Curated annotation (Swiss-Prot):
One term under GO cellular component: cell division site
Protein's recorded name: Cell division protein DivIB
Membrane spanning stretches: 26-46
Pfam name, any one: FtsQ_DivIB_C
Similarity remark: Belongs to the FtsQ/DivIB family. DivIB subfamily.
Positions on the Extracellular side per record topology: 47-260
Lineage summary: Bacteria, Bacillati, Bacillota, Bacilli, Lactobacillales
Origin species: Lentilactobacillus buchneri (strain NRRL B-30929) (Lactobacillus buchneri)
């Protein structure tokens, strides 16, 4: 009886050894097949694709436009997104000149979050009965609006593209508080100064300046206007001086502007 039990144990041990040896031999084959099967199951599942795309930070460009421009959409394979979010964000940024920066990241495993920063509007160009926004980058948006926002000047009478670009370049140098009190900037050349511009201020003062220098000189405007007792014409073409705006039966007295 004891011999039979011993033989049974020996047979059981040999069988287990046989199983272990076979498992060890087959493991190098089973492991890759298992991985391949898991990958295939993942690829055909909904978890392998972008579930949702959200947009934030935009004010002018709509969510719908950004999603349409984006190379990543709902249903895009995650294999096309992993490790490529910076490149994809840069591709999206190039689709609209209004976008100053774009950041893209994956959240909650398969959701894409797009954060946009837009170039702000700093003025408008009047053209053919409409107003084209001028961005902080200097770019003029071709799409026109009928009612420009208050607090931004309108550029008028600029037929020469080069002079317009120079004017915008100088205008961008002016501090935002001064920009906010500029109503219009009109190209107003003379024989003696082919680069002269005329600026109508919201406080009623009028300014004449040169394209090449008004970007720096206009920042002195608050100091100059604070010394004026009446609405005046301020000339910043050469130096700085002012005189009251001419009215009927009123003599025009030239006043030197101090502090510039």
């Amino acid at each position: 009886m004891g011999a039979q039990d011993q033989n049974g144990k020996n047979h059981g041990g040999l069988f287990r050894d046989f199983q272990n040896r076979n498992v060890k031999k087959m493991w190098p084959l089973v492991m890759p097949i298992t991985i391949i099967l898991l990958v295939m199951i993942f690829m055909i599942s909904s978890y392998s694709r972008v579930k949702k795309v959200t947009v934030s930070g935009n004010e002018i460009v709509s969510d719908q436009q950004i999603k349409a421009f984006s190379p990543v959409k709902k249903g895009t394979s995650l294999f096309a997104v992993w490790g490529k979010t910076d490149k994809l964000a840069q591709s999206l940024k190039q689709r609209s000149r209004r976008m100053q920066s774009v950041k893209m990241k994956l959240v909650n495993f398969n959701q894409v979050k797009i954060k946009v920063e837009e170039y702000p509007t700093i003025g408008y160009l009047f053209v053919h009965g409409g107003y084209q926004p001028i961005l902080k980058s200097g770019v003029i948006i071709k799409g026109k609006v009928l009612n420009p926002k208050a607090g931004f000047p309108v550029l008028k009478k600029f037929q020469n593209p080069k002079k317009l670009r120079r004017t915008i370049k100088q205008y961008r140098r002016i501090s935002p508080p001064v920009r906010a009190v500029m109503n219009t900037i009109s190209f107003s050349p003379t024989k003696s100064n082919p680069d002269r511009i005329f600026i109508q201020m919201s406080d009623g003062n009028k300014v004449y300046a040169s394209i090449s220098t008004f970007g720096d000189k206009m920042d002195y405007y608050p100091s100059i206007s604070s010394k004026l007792k009446v609405k005046s014409v301020i000339n910043l073409e050469v130096g700085a001086y002012s005189y009251p705006i001419p009215q009927k039966q009123t003599s025009t007295k030239t006043t030197s502007v101090q502090g510039y």
